[in-house]
Amino acid sequence: MIISSASDYREAARRRVPPFMFHYADGGSYAEQTLARNVSDLENIALRQRVLKDMSELDTSIELFGEKLSMPTILAPVGACGMYARRGEVQAAQAADNKGVPFTLSTVSICPIEEVAPAIKRPMWFQLYVLKDRGFMKNALERAKAAGCSTLVFTVDMPTPGARYRDMHSGMSGPYKEIRRVLQGFTHPFWAYDVGIKGKPHTLGNVSTYMGRQIGLDDYIGWLTENFDPSISWKDLEWIREFWEGPMVIKGILDPEDAKDAVRFGADGIVVSNHGGRQLDGVLSSARALPPIADAVKGDIKIIADSGIRNGLDIVRMLALGADATMLGRAFVYALGAAGRQGVENMLDIFKKEMRVAMTLTSNRTIVDIKPEALVDLSKL
């Protein structure tokens, strides 16, 4: 099929990847209202076109935590990303490396830290959950540091997994899930060979390395449910700082007061995020949550935004709403599932081209030039 946008990659991934993995990435929690609002709220913000400005020199690059990024985006942590392409985390990391942006490895990745880090030149980021087993957390931080990871992304909006009803229907969870997955593999032979056979082992690499035994995909949801720690508090940041000296970003902030606390407890950045609508359905979209957070802490801490970004225009919208950078999750997973490393590289090229068009026609030569004045909120017209 012809690929011209991220939405095309979504359709291509739907065809190639079996339903239990496609819907795991594509779905949200409960009735998926927040998932839908993440997209629609961005769509309802129009760009303010300005003309007859000299836009012959345009720069999409930024510096973030001492790193030069070719565009203001980072590939977000995605659990079990290695199930969308053969050793998928390695392919996605190499694509990000080639395009000059960071890749964030999830705690619950298929490929372990020690496999991904040597495959790329630039330092990757590492994402960590608060888990009941503090020994695992300490081990993961030590391994990430030893592998040269530059930035820690500390995810705080998962003290318990969200209720993802779509997973029950797709075979990711629910009755007879193992049989349903095998049957889906038969109807998706290219994926079954490339990932199912050539992409083994299908284990949670970081967890298995620590446990000394294989924690497979069948154990994935159960392991998360058992090990997430609902006692998480701001004091956990102080404990983590004992083992991590580099930049630390708190992911899962939707309230200005929490953003202020992140500043107070010494975080270097926050990610304004509702976990892509995968945790608590009914919360604010990131686009709606971002402006008051930016008003509260802009300049005191780096602000990254995710959830709902489907094209380069959405990146410009998030920047104008107050973000310093963005994270891409579903968009790169669709591309990875559709075409592996090449798909992710092409997706990033598409986003960058869309950004350049938007910046040119809103008369913003650099990323720091993009301000709220570049937007028109259609809901107020």
UniProtKB/Swiss-Prot annotation:
Cofactors (names): FMN
Pfam families tied to this protein: FMN_dh
Membership in a protein family: Belongs to the FMN-dependent alpha-hydroxy acid dehydrogenase family.
Annotated keywords: Cell inner membrane, Cell membrane, Flavoprotein, FMN, Membrane, Oxidoreductase
Binding site residues for substrate: Y24, Y129, R164, R278
Protein name, UniProt field: L-lactate dehydrogenase
Family annotation (PROSITE patterns): FMN_HYDROXY_ACID_DH_1 (PS00557), FMN_HYDROXY_ACID_DH_2 (PS51349)
EC identifiers of the protein: 1.1.-.-
Chief location: membrane
Subcellular location: Cell inner membrane
Root EC class: oxidoreductase
InterPro entries referenced in this protein's UniProt entry, alphabetically: Aldolase_TIM, Alpha-hydoxy_acid_DH_FMN, FMN-dep_DH, FMN_HAD, FMN_hydac_DH_AS, LldD
Single GO molecular function: L-lactate dehydrogenase activity
Reaction it catalyzes: (S)-lactate + A = pyruvate + AH2
Binding site for FMN: 106, 127, 155, 251, 306-330
Active-site residues annotated for this sequence: H275 (proton acceptor)
Signal peptide positions (record): none
GO biological process terms, semicolon-separated: aerobic respiration; lactate metabolic process
Stated role: Catalyzes the conversion of L-lactate to pyruvate. Is coupled to the respiratory chain.
Membrane topology annotation: Peripheral membrane protein
Domain FMN hydroxy acid dehydrogenase, residue spans: 1-380
Entry's Gene Ontology cellular component terms: plasma membrane
